[in-house]
Amino acid sequence: MIRFEIHGENLTITDAIRNYIEEKIGKLERYFNDVPNATAHVKVKTYQNSATKIEVTIPLKKVTLRAEERNDDLYAGIDLINNKLERQVRKYKTRVNRRNRNRGEQEAFASLPEEKEAVEIQNDENEADNEIEIIRAKNFSLKPMDSEEAVLQMDLLGHDFFIFTDRETDGTSIVYKRKDGKYGLIETTE
């Protein structure tokens, strides 16, 4: 069962908003044979120009579903988020079931009703073009540096992320450029 943690920023989450979110995103449960025990973290933020930003993160056992949408209409934004999440689940479902079929394992996801199967087949054909294909591989040594040096190196190379060995912790870390133009840091733990 998917539980919901819904937080509003500059907005009071009414029962109507809560029910709409739970109804729409709760429909994702139909894609699973065993409904995962998961918590959907939903953050709704309104801006001064009345635009809303909806972020949904659902951490599952082997994958994290995440979608973000900005829209002037809160309910339309929730619908768009739901479509994005469904697309992610279908894509993941196709990969997992294909891999399991090759191994002879039981399918982890539920079969959809027949009317949905036709849509699923069409989507699978479109997604076949989007198969993961690694077209280039690089090998390089990680240099010890701090996060500031890594950001400078990343900007110098014109990349969106940079992997390095943290001089202080001796662990592998990643700096990345966020959508808002600021920087993020991912540190590994053992």
From Swiss-Prot:
SUPFAM superfamilies: Ribosome binding protein Y (YfiA homologue)
Protein name in the entry: Ribosome hibernation promotion factor
Gene Ontology CC annotations of this record: cytosolic small ribosomal subunit
Keyword Calcium: no
Key words, A-Z: Cytoplasm, Translation regulation
Molecular-function GO terms, alphabetical: ribosomal small subunit binding
Lineage top rank: taxon: Bacteria
Gene: hpf
InterPro entries: HPF/YfiA_ribosome-assoc, HPF_long/plastid, RHF-like, RHF/RaiA, Ribosom_S30AE_C, Ribosom_S30AE_C_sf
Family stated for the protein in its record: Belongs to the HPF/YfiA ribosome-associated protein family. Long HPF subfamily.
GO BP term, example: negative regulation of translational elongation
The protein's assembly and partners: Interacts with 100S ribosomes.
Cellular location(s): Cytoplasm
Biological function: Required for dimerization of active 70S ribosomes into 100S ribosomes in stationary phase; 100S ribosomes are translationally inactive and sometimes present during exponential growth.
